[in-house]
Amino acid sequence: MDIRAAEISAILKEQIKNFGKEAEVSEVGQVLSVGDGIARVYGLDNVQAGEMVEFPGGIRGMALNLESDNVGVVIFGADRDIKEGDVVKRTGAIVDVPVGPELLGRVVDALGNPIDGKGPIKAKERRRVDVKAPGIIPRKSVHEPMSTGLKAIDALIPVGRGQRELVIGDRQTGKTAIILDTFLNQKPIHDNGPDKDKLYCVYVAVGQKRSTVAQFVKVLEERGALEYSIVVAATASDPAPMQYLAPFAGCAMGEYFRDNGQHALIGYDDLSKQAVAYRQMSLLLRRPPGREAYPGDVFYLHSRLLERAAKLNDENGAGSLTALPVIETQGNDVSAFIPTNVISITDGQIFLETNLFYQGIRPAVNVGLSVSRVGSSAQIKAMKQVAGSIKGELAQYREMAAFAQFGSDLDAATQRLLNRGARLTELLKQPQFSPLKTEEQVAVIYAGVNGYLDKLAVNQVGKFEEGLLASLRTEHKDVLEGIRNEKALTDDLKAKLKAAIDAFAKSFA
């Protein structure tokens, strides 16, 4: 066998080139014990808090407890495949997720991996899940409306862009339905509104049944709302660390829009289950328990998440992230630990009540207990003009209704108040999946507060509203357009609206 000289020089060059290459050093540790989704790892001396580590078979985990002789790692996946003595590698990266418009229309898990079978996500950017909230200087006070399409909320408990409004109530009172209707209400703006008004939606399902999440996605898809929405799902069968992480992952995805001068809305459904998952992790990591066995930093868990919802000022792009966290109460007890925590963090709350729900008042909003701490600065002027008196009238009505149960002989003024209140309550009812545009709400509420419903039987109010809206949408488009463009009820518009309602009321009778 003969080797040519040229070949020898090529081989020597290759050898010389590869000589002295340093071996790659990666820091590894060893699993001491594993169980209940927690691994104790020996080694990994330089690991960072919150760093992603990798177990054999590609299972990932996150270092949470950094102790003197071992590291407590929570496992994002099944712990069955990890055994004592397994080698654990550092990745050097803090937990992050893909973000950007590529995620719109997709369903992902808490680590941003697609779970909808529509192929991989080619995101151009990744972000850390747990970042610091914007400070005081980059923010601006909330002043633009974030319309939900629900009369009871937009008129009485208005939510602004950049606000955090808690949705709180017992199970099966329609909490998720409020978030779903709000998402669906953004469709007209996405279809033919200006880009600067578009609101991208993120839904985070924590500890929900898979069937519930599938139903939610199906409704969004059928109604064409999935194209501007992202769904992050950590269902009941997912490990606790995934349920803990999902809200932070969803928030990072929403922040991408906020920081790029766009607007996003995120619904956390629900934070009670995130707190339970966090409690489970903390107790298994042997952190000391506090009230109701929650760890001492469970308040910080929710406050650092919800503080990231903000309205940024013009120098920072004027984007916003609005949060609608959900809390499930047990037996209407809003003074339990987690509900009081989240009430104190948010800028107002929407209380949903079981007995209202069963009385057929849906959405089952308790108007007396619900507040928006941003208030009317998150409403257009037209809505302020018509809805100003309605809250007071309803408060008087509730007081009188409780009182009137005892006495039969009521004077005319009280009778009038009770009649008006019953009709306004009826007017605020709304079927699911039928959000109304703001200008339509203004017209309907104008009819309610100006006595057009007083002569009708209570069971006719719904029909009157449907008929009035149909008439306005076909014969009086100019009135609705006027309210939409002017954002206020000028004398001219008021006269036109009054004439339109008068004409319809005559034909309805």
Curated annotation (Swiss-Prot):
What is a single cellular component term in the Gene Ontology annotation?
plasma membrane
- Which InterPro entries does the UniProt record give? ATP_synth_asu-like_sf, ATP_synth_asu_C, ATP_synth_asu_C_sf, ATP_synth_F1_a_nt-bd_dom, ATP_synth_F1_asu, ATPase_a/bsu_AS, ATPase_F1/V1/A1_a/bsu_N, ATPase_F1/V1/A1_a/bsu_N_sf
Residues where ATP binds: 169-176
The site feature described as Required for activity is recorded at 370
Q: Where in the cell is it found?
A: Cell inner membrane
Query: Which EC class, in a word?
Result: translocase
GO terms (molecular function) for this protein are:
ADP binding; ATP binding; proton-transporting ATP synthase activity, rotational mechanism
Keywords, alphabetical? ATP synthesis, ATP-binding, Cell inner membrane, Cell membrane, CF(1), Hydrogen ion transport, Ion transport, Membrane, Nucleotide-binding, Translocase, Transport
Record's catalysed reaction(s):
ATP + H2O + 4 H(+)(in) = ADP + phosphate + 5 H(+)(out)
Give the way it sits in the membrane.
Peripheral membrane protein
List the Pfam families: ATP-synt_ab, ATP-synt_ab_C, ATP-synt_ab_N
UniProt function note: Produces ATP from ADP in the presence of a proton gradient across the membrane. The alpha chain is a regulatory subunit.
Subunit record text: F-type ATPases have 2 components, CF(1) - the catalytic core - and CF(0) - the membrane proton channel. CF(1) has five subunits: alpha(3), beta(3), gamma(1), delta(1), epsilon(1). CF(0) has three main subunits: a(1), b(2) and c(9-12). The alpha and beta chains form an alternating ring which encloses part of the gamma chain. CF(1) is attached to CF(0) by a central stalk formed by the gamma and epsilon chains, while a peripheral stalk is formed by the delta and b chains.
Q: NCBIfam families in the record, alphabetically? A: atpA, PRK13343.1
This protein's name? ATP synthase subunit alpha
